[in-house]
Swiss-Prot record:
GO annotation terms (biological process): innate immune response
Biological function: Nucleotidyltransferase that catalyzes the formation of cyclic GMP-AMP (2',3'-cGAMP) from ATP and GTP and plays a key role in innate immunity. Directly binds some unknown ligand, activating the nucleotidyltransferase activity, leading to synthesis of 2',3'-cGAMP, a second messenger that binds to and activates Sting, thereby triggering the immune response via activation of the NF-kappa-B transcription factor.
A matching Pfam family: Mab-21
Protein name listed in UniProt: Cyclic GMP-AMP synthase-like receptor
């Protein structure tokens, strides 16, 4: 009769207890035969179900079934002997154990051991041979795991190698074959470009919104718009132009540009612009204009204190230097008025100063952040400069279209008080509103993102690239955009590389035509040989990314 039969178990219990009574205590785990058979059938079904579930799970993973380790056998044989003993006999489990998942796990382990020939004796203790077998299987399992790990690592390394090869092939396929060109590689070593891309999107929306609100509600409404209370000649229309409104702003939101259009009564009649033409003796004045005073329109002679003599045909002119100084003084007085009230929306401010054609205002806000604002005074001209009449006509552009060119010309232009070094009575022609019209449509947002990355790189090397400025970059961007296909079949890396290479070539040739005036005005004509050498050296280093 088998070792685990009911009769043998009864005899063993009677021998231990010294009893000959046919009644066996329930503590011995002996139940009536019918109940025992029912429990055996239930336990066998539970074990089979667990085994089938494990088998299906292991097959779905594509790996062989995990084998119990020596640690599992020691735990099941030493710490839970009563469970294995009663399971082997087909009797009930320890109270409170059979209803838990841990008991089911132990039963399944026992079934697996039995299926592999690892018989557990009636005393539920593993023999030395069984432990050796378990240890050997545990070692094999660890070896298999290491094998799987090594195989996965090989697959991952192979995948990375394929990615590197594909990237290298893509770079070779898209690289320029021009002799002497410098290639901006699309790799992790290109730290310059990756930093620029990161900085490009670093503008905090909360920060820029707070500062834009300060500019709109304080600077525009409380300062600039209230200047007329001090001098009623100075009434303004605010023109939202500049990098922020063109969505070309990069870096910190600590600088804003505001254009204010002088809008006095009959101003366009009182001052008539006289644009300089491209003549041999006055080529240096292309892009500038005189504002000639028409005295018969100024009945009260209100503007005589801002005039100077010595213009063409000996007519009085509106002086850019005098009006800029007067405008700065008006802003200073208005700041003092607000500061005296004691409810100023800033912690401190600096006295207004001249910064090119602008008056610079500097504020320290309540959060200790500094904000610089350049207020540019301008006067509108109803006429398009004759020197720019050929824009978009002689050489039709891919962009913008003919209709957009015509609409821009009808709106005229502006003049700002930036003097010419050779003639300080001139006003510089400004095409800011025309540039805003060209750069505002969302259809060119993708190209603008490329330009912003280049602009970030420029800001990082600004000192080494002097006297280049952001306006030179914008002009080149407009020219490249007008070609229509500068981004065609190029990745972002290649577009930026192409932009910098074009800038390098323009500097080397000392030639960058004004976008609207064309070759009549070369923005790089005043570059010295030393400046060209410094700029080209810096640009080569940027492209090489050393």
């Amino acid at each position: 009769m088998p070792v685990g039969s009911r009769q043998n178990r009864v005899q063993a219990v009677r021998k231990v207890s010294g009893s000959t009574d046919s009644t066996i205590p329930r503590e011995a785990g002996i139940y009536p035969i019918r109940y025992t058979e029912r429990k055996e059938r239930k336990d066998v079904q539970t074990v089979e179900n667990g085994t089938n579930e494990d088998s299906r799970a292991s097959q779905s993973r594509g790996r062989r079934r995990r084998q119990p380790t020596s640690r599992t056998l020691r735990q099941t044989s030493q710490s839970r002997p009563e469970v294995l003993e009663r399971n082997e006999s087909g009797s009930d489990c320890k109270k409170g154990v059979h209803s838990h998942s841990s008991a089911r796990k132990v039963e399944r382990e026992g079934s697996r051991c039995a299926s592999r020939g690892l018989h557990l004796s009636s005393t539920t203790r593993c023999t030395a041979x069984e432990l050796d077998v378990a240890k050997q299987e545990e070692k094999e399992e660890e070896d298999n795991k290491e094998g799987y790990a090594d195989e996965e690592q090989k697959i991952e390394n192979s995948t990375q190698e394929r990615k590197v090869v594909n990237t290298s092939m893509e770079d070779k396929a898209t690289s320029h074959s021009t002799k002497g060109s410098f290639r901006l590689t699309n790799s992790d070593s290109n730290k310059e470009l990756h930093k620029a891309i990161k900085v490009r999107g670093s503008l905090s929306k909360t920060d820029i919104t707070e500062k834009a609100k300060f500019v709109n509600e304080v600077v525009e409404k409380e300062i600039i718009s209230q200047v007329f209370k001090i001098d009623n000649r100075f009434t303004f229309d605010i023109l939202h132009a500049g990098s922020y409104y063109e969505r070309l702003k990069v870096g910190e939101a600590d600088e804003f540009d505001i254009m204010v259009q002088l809008n006095a009564a009959k101003l366009s009649n009182i001052f008539q612009p006289r644009f300089c033409v491209a003549r041999r003796h006055s080529r240096h004045l292309v892009g500038f204009a005189y504002l000639e005073y028409q005295s018969h329109f100024d009945g009260h002679k209100k503007w005589e204190d801002l005039l100077e003599t010595g213009g063409p045909d000996s007519r009085p002119l509106l002086s850019p230097k005098l009006i800029l100084e007067h405008f700065k003084e008006l802003l200073s007085q208005r700041l003092h008025q607000i500061n005296c009230v004691g409810k100023q929306p800033w912690r401190s401010y600096c006295e207004p100063s001249l910064h090119g054609p602008a008056v610079k205002l500097t504020f320290c806000l309540a959060n200790d952040k500094t904000l610089d604002i350049d207020v540019v005074l301008c006067i509108q001209s109803q006429h398009w400069p004759p020197v720019a009449n050929n824009w978009g006509v002689l050489n039709p552009l891919q962009w913008p279209g003919a209709q957009q060119v015509e609409n821009i010309k009808k709106r005229g232009c502006h003049v700002v008080p930036k003097v010419n070094p050779r003639d300080q009575k001139c006003w510089r022609t400004s095409f800011s509103l025309a540039e805003k019209d060209l750069l505002s449509p969302k259809s060119i947002d993708e190209d603008k993102e490329h330009y912003k990355i280049v602009k970030v790189i420029f800001e990082r090397h600004k000192a080494s690239l002097e006297p280049l400025c952001s306006y030179h970059l914008k002009t080149l961007f407009l020219w490249l955009r007008s070609d229509g296909n500068w981004t065609e079949k190029r990745t972002q890396f290649k577009v930026i590389e192409y932009f910098i290479q074009q800038l390098l070539e323009k500097v080397r040739m000392k030639e960058l035509p004004h976008f609207f005036i064309g070759h009549n005005l070369n923005l790089f004509s005043d570059l010295s040989d030393a400046q060209v050498t410094n700029i080209t050296t810096c640009l080569k280093e940027i492209i090489k990314n050393k």
